[in-house]
Every structure is written in structure tokens, then in C-alpha cells.
A protein has these predicted regions:
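Carbohydrate-active catalytic/glycan-binding domains of CAZyme proteins
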Residues: 3-360
């Protein structure tokens, strides 16, 4: 049974730095959580000093805890390769690593957003690594753009034909917005595979796993079904909230409904949060608006943070905490963490300042 964080520990800010067992600020940004063997494992991006620290110079860091408060440094779970022919080398971009456990293969499966070295954010790939143990080491398998040559399940035949090309449109114009919503970028990337940037993983009650990512130049989310071993894509996927411009997805299930909390597109700067709901993971998603309740500044910045993962606090899908990042792009290693209890007003997820936890 997962540990239940006492309510008093969520009653407001408790400082800035969150120290591990060595007295060092936890270095696991854009992270996610795995609960296995009565232990929480926190995986995240290992940042280094300065602006250059936003690149993957080290790898994915892992920490373990029995109570979500006191964290033990488990080291680097996935290291950058020393093989210069590998795609996963120091200086590339690796963001938002997430890990799930596969009961069939007994493997721990990590997916992450991967950009190639010296190519900015053009590659927009997702990477895969696997391990026999939760804290690693993880073996890098490959990176790809998924579902090449496959249309989404909810994409109409009438939209599959190219009618207008991107070069003919002014980015940001009403014509461009309509083109994007109709699937212009999806059609552009059809042959080579769909883009993957900010991402999340989710295991449903039937043990089927899904990969969600900001796709189509971050204009539209895709939810993609994974194979039984969680190491590939089945080809079944849907477009979610077309042209909704969502990043930082955190997805969870409560009382038979599926929810997500996301952010808008403002780079490293915080912005108003977003939320959405669906009756099924691959079904129609309905936008619910900004879940934040607080001052105008708090609501407009999601308490100066960006969502990354929703922690199931009781193992029953009844109580969740949103993990979020407070980015420091000028000195990446100094990024902070904000955890917010997710309340509900009927079917609407709510984030309140009095339920914010910022570390110890």
C-alpha cells in the first residue's frame, strides 16, 4: 500500500531546496514516479550548471523513498553513451523520463523525449531504455518517431488529402490555426512518423499502457497504445484536443474518468494550467479550463511551475498529488519542485495554493 503523506505536510511552502540523504538538492527534473516493492522511485533529468545544463550531459537520475519525504540517491539510472555513434550522447536533449513496470516481461521500461545533439528541437523523437531493476542501470534501445504511415483512429478520411501546404501560410494566422487543427502537421509527418516532445506514460486498469506526447509541433497531443511488452507501439493512436497547444502532460484516472493536467506553450516560463477529462483513455477529451485557484499571478503561472506527473497517493486512484517543476533555465541545476494536492469540484480537478508542497 503506497504511503499516504500526512495532510499537514501539504499545508503550504516549506522552503526551496529539497535535499537527499547526502544533503544535496534532488536532481530529477521533469520527473515521474514509479511505485514498486513498497518503494517510490523518482526519475528525472539530471541537470548541470548554467544554461548548458539544460542539455543531457549526464543522464537520468533516480532516487528512492519509503515515504515521499526522505529520498536516497540511487545514482544515474540511464547514462549518456560513450559510443560516439550512439544517438544518446552527452550534449543531446533528454527530457521527461517516465518508467513503468511490465508484469509479463518483468522489465522496467523507460520512455523519454529525445532530441539529437546539436539539432535543437528538430528531431522530436521518443527514446526507449529497459532494465531488470527499478533503479537501473537502464540499457538504451532506440529512439524513433512513432506510427509512420499510420493515420490516427479519430482522423477523418476527408482530412487525409493535402489541400494547403505550410509554406503557403503565415504562422499564427487564422488560416494557419485552422490548417493545424485539421491536421496539417500530422499530414506533413505521416511518412516519417509523428513528433514526440513533452510526454507521459499511463497504465490502465487492464494493464494496457499508453504513451502521450505533445506532437504536431506541440499543437496537438497524441495518445498512443503500447505493445504488450510496453517497448513498441501497436499503431493505434488518437489526436487529443487538436490545436489545443498543450505541454507538460500529467494523466491519471479517478472514479472511472480520465483526467489530464497540462500547460500552455511559453518555453521555460510558467503559464496558466489546463485540464481535461474523458470517459475512456482513447476517447473524446473535453477541455475543463485552468485548474488553479489562487491569486491572479498564481493562476496565471500555475504557482510558478509546470506539470509533469500525477502521483497516486493511496494506490486506489482516490488521492493524487501533481508533481511540477519550477525551471531555472539560466542555471538548470537550480530548478525547484512544487507538489500540489489535486482536489475535485465535482468532475473538475482543482489546484489550491494551501495544498502546495515545495520540499523540506
Amino acid at each position: 500500500m503506497p504511503f499516504i503523506l500526512p495532510s499537514q505536510e501539504l499545508s503550504g511552502p516549506q522552503g526551496g531546496l529539497w535535499l537527499d540523504n547526502n544533503g544535496v538538492h534532488i536532481n530529477a527534473h521533469g520527473g515521474g514516479m514509479l511505485y514498486q516493492n513498497d518503494t517510490y522511485y523518482w526519475f528525472g533529468e539530471h541537470k548541470t550548471d548554467g544554461k548548458g545544463g539544460n542539455r543531457a550531459n549526464v543522464g537520468v537520475h533516480c532516487y528512492s523513498s519509503k515515504n515521499l519525504m526522505d529520498w536516497t540517491d540511487e545514482g544515474i539510472a540511464l547514462k549518456m553513451s560513450e559510443d560516439t555513434t550512439s544517438l544518446l550522447v552527452a550534449g543531446c536533449i533528454l527530457e521527461r523520463p517516465k518508467v513503468i513496470y511490465n508484469e509479463l516481461t518483468k522489465k522496467y521500461v523507460m520512455w523519454f523525449h529525445h532530441e539529437l545533439k546539436d539539432q535543437g528541437y528538430d528531431a522530436a523523437m521518443t527514446g526507449l531504455a529497459i532494465s531488470d531493476t527499478p533503479s537501473g542501470p537502464y540499457e538504451y534501445i532506440r529512439s524513433l518517431r512513432p506510427n509512420a504511415g499510420i493515420w490516427p483512429m479519430n482522423f477523418p478520411d476527408s482530412s487525409k488529402e493535402i489541400k494547403t501546404r505550410l509554406d503557403d501560410l503565415e504562422r499564427g494566422s487564422e488560416e494557419w490555426k485552422a490548417w493545424s487543427k485539421e491536421g496539417g502537421y500530422l499530414r506533413r509527418d505521416f511518412e516519417g512518423g509523428q513528433m514526440c516532445r513533452d510526454m507521459a506514460l499511463f497504465i490502465d486498469v487492464d494493464d494496457r499502457a499508453y504513451h502521450m506526447a505533445s506532437s504536431e509541433e506541440n499543437q496537438t497531443l497524441h495518445i498512443r497504445e503500447l505493445t504488450d511488452d510496453y517497448q513498441d507501439f501497436t499503431g493505434k493512436y488518437v489526436r487529443v484536443l487538436p490545436a489545443g497547444r498543450n505541454e507538460g502532460p500529467a494523466i491519471f484516472r479517478k472514479d472511472g474518468k480520465y483526467y489530464m493536467i497540462t500547460s500552455g506553450l511559453t518555453g521555460w516560463k510558467p503559464n496558466p494550467g489546463k485540464s481535461a477529462m474523458a470517459d475512456s483513455i482513447m476517447g473524446e477529451w473535453t477541455a475543463l479550463g485552468n485548474p488553479c485557484i489562487g491569486t491572479e499571478e498564481e493562476e496565471n503561472t500555475t504557482f510558478e511551475s509546470q506539470s509533469t506527473y500525477a502521483i497516486d497517493m493511496d494506490g486506489k486512484g482516490k488521492r493524487y498529488i501533481l508533481m511540477a517543476d519550477r525551471w531555472r533555465p539560466e542555471n538548470a541545476i537550480d530548478g525547484r519542485y512544487v507538489w500540489i494536492q489535486i482536489d475535485f469540484d465535482e468532475n473538475n480537478p482543482i489546484l489550491k495554493w494551501e495544498n502546495v508542497f515545495e520540499g523540506k
